[in-house]
Design a protein with these regions (language model features):
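Alpha-helical transmembrane bundle of multi-pass membrane proteins
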Residues: 1-189, 198, 204, 208-319
Length: 319
């Protein structure tokens, strides 16, 4: 976006154009991911101290503060830089707390699909982001990049309003010895009476799980690396899955898509980004529909095999 480059880039006298250096562009993009990583770590604890709903409201407010700092930036790339980090802190907190609340309030038979729905909404948000940028790309003022950022407030407000309507996690309430509220929450989620025998049974099962967890005592970081259990094996598996997912390079296209598409000769990289976002969204819909039917591991194997085939085809074509 030309106006964005004019505000936060450097002027090149030889061409008479503004540009973003590779270092500055890399920092502006990377700081969001770094903020997400830090936010996921530091805000996760709020779920146990303040409750899932209030914790989500707090991280969304942090997200909004980051957006305000970015929108108010004017010819100060370092201000935008700071806003990007804070923006990421809020997004990282949401990425931990929202699936946590979903998994604890969702009915058992819908839990997998609803947690997957979180990822679906993320891909839909990416698609809407591409559309908003496409719609403002021809503006010749700061609205070119401020409008897409400003739209983030809409999604943040929807989350905050949603937290007023969603019941608190029954598990959190039982952990706080608020058993009556926990039963009311279970009843509201399943649209039955708080005195229903099924509600009482569910509350007892959650309470038993909480008590069993307490009997195990506080876990230590050292236990993560113990070879006496399978915790280390699961930890390594989880880390490797996420690591290899990033190494496939898919996020490279999401972050630098318009630049990449223009560099290979496409006239409008913004249109191609919308196509990418559309494919990403509908692929996630398929995953949500089948995850509970064929299982998580099998889904992972199928999609990884599909990716391998596509990458092999690309390598053969390029060769």
């Amino acid at each position: 976006m030309d106006n964005f480059k004019m505000n936060f880039g450097s002027y090149k006298h030889s061409t008479g154009e503004y540009y973003l250096s590779n270092v500055r562009m890399g920092l502006l993009v990377a700081m969001f991911s770094i903020g997400c990583a830090i936010g996921g770590l530091i805000f996760a604890r709020l779920a146990d101290t303040l409750g899932r709903r209030l914790a989500i409201v707090i991280v969304v407010l942090v997200y909004m503060v980051g957006a305000i700092i970015q929108i108010s930036s004017n010819h100060k790339w370092y201000q935008y830089f700071v806003g990007k980090i804070i923006y990421g802190l809020g997004a990282g907190g949401c990425s931990v707390l929202c699936p946590m609340l979903l998994s604890e309030i969702a009915p058992t038979d819908l839990r997998g699909g609803l947690v997957s729905l979180y990822q679906l909404n993320m891909t839909f948000g990416i698609f809407l982001g591409y559309c908003s940028v496409y719609g403002t790309r021809k503006y010749d003022n700061t609205a070119q990049w401020r409008v897409p950022l400003g739209l983030c407030f809409l999604w943040a407000l929807i989350i905050i309003i949603g937290m007023l309507l969603v019941p608190e996690s029954p598990r959190y309430l039982i952990e706080c010895e608020r058993h009556e509220e926990a039963r009311a929450s279970i009843a509201k989620i399943n649209k039955v009476s708080p005195e229903d025998p099924w509600v009482l049974k569910q509350a007892d099962e959650i309470n038993a799980g909480v008590l069993a967890h307490r009997e195990l005592g506080e876990a230590s970081w050292k236990e993560l690396f113990s070879v006496k259990t399978k915790v280390l094996q699961r930890l390594i598996t989880g880390i490797l899955v996420q690591t290899f997912l990033q190494l496939t390079g898919e996020n490279y296209f999401f972050f630098y898509g318009t630049t990449i598409f223009k560099s290979v000769g496409l006239t409008d990289g913004f249109e191609t980004s919308i196509v990418l976002g559309t494919v990403n969204f509908f692929s996630t819909i398929i995953a949500v529909m089948v995850v509970d039917k064929i299982g998580r591991r099998k889904c992972l194997f199928i999609w990884c095999s599909w990716d391998d085939g596509l990458y092999g085809h690309i390598c053969k074509y390029r060769g």
